[in-house]
Amino acid sequence: MKRIFSGVKSPKLSAPPKVFKNDESPSTPSSPKFDQGLRSLSASASRLFSNSISTPGSPTLDLPQEHSINGDISPELVPIVTLLSAQAHRRYHYGIFLILHDLKTDGTPAARQWEECYGVLLGTQLALWDAKELSDSKNNKNTSTMKKAASRPSFINFTDASVRSLDANDQVIIASENEKTKKDLDNVLVVSTTLKNRYFLKFKNSKSFKTWNAAIRLSLFEFTALQEAYTGSFLSSRGVKLGDIKVVMADTKFTYEDWVSVRFGTGMPWKRCYAVISPQSGKKKKNSKGSICFYENNKKTKKSNIMTTVVDARALYAVYPSSPILIDTSTIIKLEGFVSFDKSEEPQETNLFIMPEKHQGVPGYDTIIRFLIPAMNAFYLYGRPKGLIANRTDPDSLLFALPTLPHIYYLQVDDVLSLTKDKNYIHWSAADWRNNIVQVLQKKLSKGYKGCGNKTVSVSSGMMKSPAISSAELFEGYDSLPERQMESPQKSKMKSPTLASTDDINSASASVNSHATSVKQTELFVTDNSSKINDSVSAQSSVTTNFKDTFTTPMTSGMLNHENSERSFGSGLKLKITDSNLENMEDVEAKSANEFSTTPEDKHIHLANAAELSALYDKYSTSPFGKSEANSSPKPQKLEVKDRSKNENRSPYERYVGTSAESKTFEIGNVRESKSTINTSLSSPLRVEDSRRSKNEDLGSLKEFEELSQKISNMGMANISSEALSDTAENSSFVTDLNLNINNSSSVNLNEEQRVPDFGEENVFDPDYMEQNQMLETESRYTTDEFDFSDNQDAASSNYSNGQTNRTVTETLSASDRNDKIPHSSLFTNLNQLTSNGGNYQDREDFSGDQINKPQQSQPLHVKGPQTSSFGYRNSSANSSQPQAPYPVGRPLGKIRTGPLTVQPMQQGGNSSMYSFQSSQHRFHSSQQRQNQSLSFRNNTYGSGNNQNTFHPSPQLQQQPQNMRYLNNKLPINDRSPIPQTQHHVPDGRPSLHINTTNRTNPLTAQSGFSQFMPPNSTSTNPYSS
């Protein structure tokens, strides 16, 4: 049978929503009020990056929620996603500086005019506003103009940018209309987000320059470190799902080949290549590494087809797709290393994006893991191929210096600022900055450092649910700011009236929501003039957004050929800037040096207000972790100033840490101290798990994943329930080894220590399950109405029986018996198949037809008596596929079990519902025994396929005969042994042909052989039919 890989299907993402109307507004889509209605907040954030123009008449669509795909994210990913969200919304620094857009994205000259900007570094994105426009709006006291100016920032993405400081070797030629002068630019950073564009950022003094430089370097370091940590948690949570993970993790000398798409530079198109990962060759030097060769086609034997070769790698990690719903589908890998385009040239330091192509029926995480592991082995990264390093104090580990929650940051800006005391820091490359930051962390880790960041900081729900930057984050200050701003109070650099202070901007932007914080709940409505503005609306300010062409940069994530930029700067940068206005701007700065002052920290708006305002900027109304239910239609966003602890839509960080009103200790729920994620509680039935993964001790190669899982789990404080779950898994050998589940709706009730989480549906993608399913299909031919071979036909014979016979037997079963522990047979891996249909005639006395039709009302049975022999009760728990009808009392049975078998009758009112018999008295004729066994094997081969609610014998009955046969190590193929009959011992060994029917409490003989398949018919002449 063809193997089907496990995993969820790729989600079909719908288009971003355009417009939705308020619940309180009964307007129709054609009404003007609907066209001007409140727009989707997430769509507004996306248009801030895409600069798209909205269409009022577009249909309403919703973004898919994560829990609609695969439920809660893996416990290993919860701390990492929390840290990634916190880093994306961390404000590293803000202030005023000059910017010059030198080259556009296509390499053509830009305006090349110095503009004064107010900038905020939030995560790895620098938001920019025109300082003159903000100042004019403040001084003119024009609220509408102020809102319009505040809601249209431009962004520079530093994620994959090349950042370099100008030094004494760099000369800038400033060409004016009259003359050309050479002038050295001090305190200038050169930023290139693509291979062709370029920006110059000039700061007013050395102090400001060092602070901005340190803040940018720290943001880039934290982003890369968290991507590596995400890769480690991704491997630990998804690696165990691969069926052949043991082979993937093995240290082999074989090459790995696959089709990939490669982007050799930001702004460059994706190129489809055939990648070949070659490990170290035995003929090479001892310290040599492997390589990754990219070919134009799969004819790799031709050397002329080689496009490029990666000869070394400094970092290799999976890129977090910015949203948890895309984790299982994203296959983008970033490689930082040295690439050779020609053998005659020296390798160049650069970054590559690699995206392995997905295969049909294979989930994305399967594809990316199969590429990551061989690539790490080739370049000896993160401890591979020996084993992934899980020690957070090791610089080579994927989890190096990972903050332990509730700490959410690696370092403060002041910690990196201390590195600028080195005189050579201005010449450092990106790798030098990273190495020096690692040294700072190593010193702190040696003293037990666990990270920084306010332990009581409350991250707003908007920050955690959406990668978009909220207006409140851009303007308002909160605890993530550095304790001391390096930007000294300065005046505006322009001739216009003084620039509004940050506190004034806060008050102006906060005034957009009319009395938003003065009431408990406030709903937003779009102003009347919103339809007159062309671009997307900002939900926080309720106005639209326009980007200025001089500031607009492409927001697509990319990377820069770092070697090219280093080569252009290495011998001294020579720039020619025509019509520069730098001198005029410097004159303005000198004249207004004492008029501008930044906002004191004690004037910042309270954090709760900032969190509430930022919540208006986000579309998502449910948690990205799937804890709350998704809504089919978006709801109007609301502000709740009080009782925020009762809000169901709190951010994931708030749900773990708790708000200030709760004073809750930070905990990570459901993060066990176990070595895998197999027995974690899953809330969605779509979550597919492989039961074979429960025995991770048999997979030696998973030790690396287990260590990563433990380290990541230690990032948060495990709760009591997780520890109890781990202890239960260790103490119960049946539950741990076989991954058993108990259906709560069944009649079998277990104690709390025997309960294990319900995994929902069976793993239909498991090859073993499919083989079992094929076996069940074969059995269905014997249970359909067409063949009429089901054991349920025996129910017709129940018309002859007395309905009250032995009814008192079941009434004697006490409640305490139902709560007794019932050990489970080691032959089953899922009790959900065994706990829904009631017992059979082998497990109890005769019942009436009503009792048989209500198997859920049957009582649990317990075995009492000596150990069975090798023949009697042969795995009766595995062969009770369907409830059996009682046989008529007082009528001769068609098939009498031959062979002397002395059995003790059942005691009335006892706790045992089965007959105890002495195995030493079992004596059989060899010919009759072989005949009975052969008939049973033929007729009941698949009798246990759909078995449910089957009685499980006690440990003393679990010993199986040596001649038991198994199919694929799953279910035994054996006969359904009839219940032992009460017969008088005959000295000559011949069986008795008559049954005493006067005592109705005596056990009845069950049919066996072909007679049980004969339909009951009163006119039948078949001597074997009853």
Curated annotation (Swiss-Prot):
InterPro entries the record matches: PH-like_dom_sf, PH_domain
Bias kind Polar residues: ranges: 623-635, 826-840, 850-884, 904-915, 935-960
SMART domains assigned to the protein according to its UniProt record, in alphabetical order: PH (SM00233)
Compositional bias of kind Basic and acidic residues: 637-653
A Pfam family this chain is assigned to: PH_26
An MF annotation (GO) of this entry: protein kinase activity
Compartments where located: Cytoplasm; Bud neck; Cell membrane
Origin superkingdom: Eukaryota
Keywords, comma-separated and alphabetical: Cell membrane, Cytoplasm, Membrane, Phosphoprotein, Repeat
Predominant cellular place of this UniProt entry's protein: cytoplasm
Residue segments, region Disordered: 1-36, 483-504, 623-658, 813-960, 1007-1026
Function of the molecule: May play a role in cell wall integrity.
Listed name of the protein: Protein SKG3
The gene coding this protein: SKG3
